[in-house]
Amino acid sequence: MNLIEQIEQEEIKRLTANKTIPPFAPGDTVIVNVNVVEGNRKRVQAYEGVVIAKRNRGLNSSFIVRKISSGEGVERTFQLYSPLLASIEVKRRGDVRRAKLYYLRERSGKSARIKEKLSFKRKEVAAQ
C-alpha cells in the first residue's frame, strides 16, 4: 500500500470513528440524515429515497439517492465520508440486477417500483 492510500485509510478511520455506516446497495431505500447549517442554526434534515448508484473510491466514495417530491423526481449525491452526514439508515432492501439504476429516471408510478429482497428477512428469522 502506497503512502497516499495509507493516508486515505487513516482519514476514513478518523471520519468514521463516531458513526457507523451500514452496508447498503443500489435498490435499497435509505434515510440519510444530513446536518444543515442555516445562519447560526444547525439542524438535521432527513432525506429518504432509493439508492440508484454507489461509487466506491476510498475517501471519494459517494452515492446517489432519488426520491419523488411533489410529483417531481429529485436526486441528491452524498459523499459517504462527509462530516455533514449525521447517519444513514437502511429502511428496505431492494432486489435489483444492476449496479446503476439510472433507468428509474425515465420511469414513474408502478414501473418505477423495486421488488423487496426477501432473503434479507429470512436470515433475520433464522437467526432468532
Swiss-Prot record:
Name by which UniProt lists this protein: Large ribosomal subunit protein bL19
Function: This protein is located at the 30S-50S ribosomal subunit interface and may play a role in the structure and function of the aminoacyl-tRNA binding site.
PROSITE patterns linked: RIBOSOMAL_L19
GO biological process: translation
Key word Ribosomal protein present: yes
GO terms assigned for molecular function: structural constituent of ribosome
Record keywords, A-Z: Ribonucleoprotein, Ribosomal protein
